[in-house]
């Protein structure tokens, strides 16, 4: 049966929403599996890797996707809970035709999402997603079903964890170890809860873990990169050298220095860029950040003579610009850091290991490395919105933004944008004085709230 209205389910990071509420319902997951299978049938007999995080609802969508794919003649390879970058790696390692991750990343347990990779582990282009949306809207899959002897089969990959662990460890030099480091590791009760502790323990670190007891309902709950205060406290309590906080699917990381201070994606990106620049490993002396990158990061790169490309917010756009501008390092403030020499997506474990390597090779504390970036005061307010009209169409908003930009001049920035995965408007203001930044951000947020908002968080 053809759907009666325009059908848009993909956002900037695949499909995402409240579990058991459209679009995150099993019927759409089944149809998505069939649509993906129909596209892949053009390649002949195909195989798809399917991974997930630890949300209770993952079982629902995993089974629906497998049913949809197999019904279209596609073989599926299940890896169970595994970080998103691990699924991208396994997709390449098995020479599969695509990979699927069931995860809502840093969101609470009651949300879920589905994102797809191509055979190289890159997220699918917008054109593929649009074609699948059109197929799902028409819902004419019965006409394309294969004969009964061509139905796909489902197989469990039992060594996916071990393969990914060895892949991650291979990005760390054999000549050094983590023997003298005490590390706090917060896995957010998410996809990294099994593999992440083993990576650091096998490299001989002393590891204090938290967020490693998922129950389906506690992913990202007061733990992980969205709640670094848990790792900060553990660093203090255990007198650790460093803290590592992953998000729910372990594609992003926030680090904590020995003084329990947060080291975010911008600073980690700068640390790694400087190291790669010195070793002549930074391709074209270029790094990709985003429009949200802190001005302190931009100025630190300028001092090095490193060009900064500013992409849209979202790791898929960072990666697109890395490919477009021939860069091998990119990332965003939230903790997605992409090393294209190692993987095709953000990888929290790989990023953390690169920073630890630099600490060891330079005999530096993380706080010393982080001091390279003199961060500008910055705030970001999130306003829940009832709709997403063009921001340019809201005259009062345009006026207040212009006023704030005039006040800041060349010493600050304003960025107002909609989230690609939530019904949220984000207001970012950056400038030389923290109190002024907060005041100006609130002025803009108040107008957003009055015009289209529900509540400010």
UniProtKB/Swiss-Prot annotation:
GO molecular function, one term: magnesium ion binding
SUPFAM superfamilies assigned to the protein according to its UniProt record, in alphabetical order: Phosphoglucomutase, C-terminal domain, Phosphoglucomutase, first 3 domains
Modified residue annotations for Phosphoserine: 105
Residues at the catalytic site: 105 (phosphoserine intermediate)
PROSITE patterns named in the record: PGM_PMM (PS00710)
Co-factor requirement: Mg(2+)
Keyword Isomerase assigned: yes
Catalysis performed (reactions): alpha-D-glucosamine 1-phosphate = D-glucosamine 6-phosphate
Annotated GO biological process: carbohydrate metabolic process; peptidoglycan biosynthetic process; UDP-N-acetylglucosamine biosynthetic process
Coiled coil: none
UniProt cofactor note: Binds 1 Mg(2+) ion per subunit.
Pfam families: PGM_PMM_I, PGM_PMM_II, PGM_PMM_III, PGM_PMM_IV
EC numbers: 5.4.2.10
Function: Catalyzes the conversion of glucosamine-6-phosphate to glucosamine-1-phosphate.
Record protein name field: Phosphoglucosamine mutase
Organism: Protochlamydia amoebophila (strain UWE25)
Gene: glmM
């Amino acid at each position: 049966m053809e759907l009666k209205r325009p059908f848009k389910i993909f956002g900037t990071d695949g499909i995402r929403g409240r579990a058991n509420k459209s679009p995150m319902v099993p019927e759409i997951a089944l149809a998505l599996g069939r649509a993906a299978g129909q596209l892949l049938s053009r390649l002949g007999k195909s195989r798809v890797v399917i991974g997930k995080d630890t949300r209770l609802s993952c079982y629902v969508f995993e089974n629906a996707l497998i049913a949809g794919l197999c019904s279209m003649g596609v073989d599926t390879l299940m890896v169970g809970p595994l970080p998103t970058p691990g699924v991208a790696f396994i997709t390449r390692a098995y020479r599969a035709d695509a990979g699927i991750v069931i995860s809502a990343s840093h969101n609470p347990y009651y949300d879920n999402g589905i994102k797809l990779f191509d055979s190289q582990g890159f997220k699918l282009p917008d054109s593929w997603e649009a074609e699948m949306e059109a197929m799902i809207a028409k819902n004419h899959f019965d006409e394309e079903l294969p004969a009964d002897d061509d139905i796909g089969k489902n197989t469990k990959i039992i060594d996916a964890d071990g393969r990914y662990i060895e892949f991650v460890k291979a990005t760390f030099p054999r000549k050094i170890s983590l023997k003298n480091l005490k590390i706090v590791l917060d896995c957010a009760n998410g996809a990294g809860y099994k593999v992440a502790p083993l990576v650091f323990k096998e490299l001989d670190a002393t590891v204090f873990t938290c967020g490693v007891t998922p129950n389906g309902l506690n992913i990202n709950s007061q733990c992980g990169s969205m709640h670094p205060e848990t790792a900060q406290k553990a660093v203090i309590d255990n007198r650790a050298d460093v803290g590592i906080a992953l998000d729910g699917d372990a594609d992003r990381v926030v680090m904590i220095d020995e003084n329990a201070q947060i080291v975010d994606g911008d600073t980690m990106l700068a640390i790694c860029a400087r190291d790669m620049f010195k070793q002549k490993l930074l391709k074209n002396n270029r790094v990709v950040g985003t429009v949200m990158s802190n001005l302190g990061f931009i100025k630190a790169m300028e001092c090095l003579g490193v060009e900064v490309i500013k992409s849209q917010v979202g790791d898929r756009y960072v990666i697109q610009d890395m490919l477009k501008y021939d860069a091998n390092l990119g990332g965003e403030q939230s903790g997605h850091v992409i090393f294209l020499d190692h993987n095709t997506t953000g990888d929290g474990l790989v990023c953390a290991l690169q920073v630890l390597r630099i600490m060891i090779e330079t005999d530096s504390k993380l706080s010393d490395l982080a001091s390279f970036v003199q961060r500008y005061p910055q705030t970001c307010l999130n306003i829940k919105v009832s709709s997403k009209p063009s921001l340019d169409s809201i005259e009062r908003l345009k006026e207040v933004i212009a006023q704030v930009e005039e006040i800041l001049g060349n010493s600050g920035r304003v960025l107002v944008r909609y989230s690609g995965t939530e019904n949220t408007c984000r207001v970012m203001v950056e400038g030389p004085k923290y109190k002024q930044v907060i005041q100006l951000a609130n002025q803009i947020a108040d107008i957003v709230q009055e015009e289209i908002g529900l509540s400010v968080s």
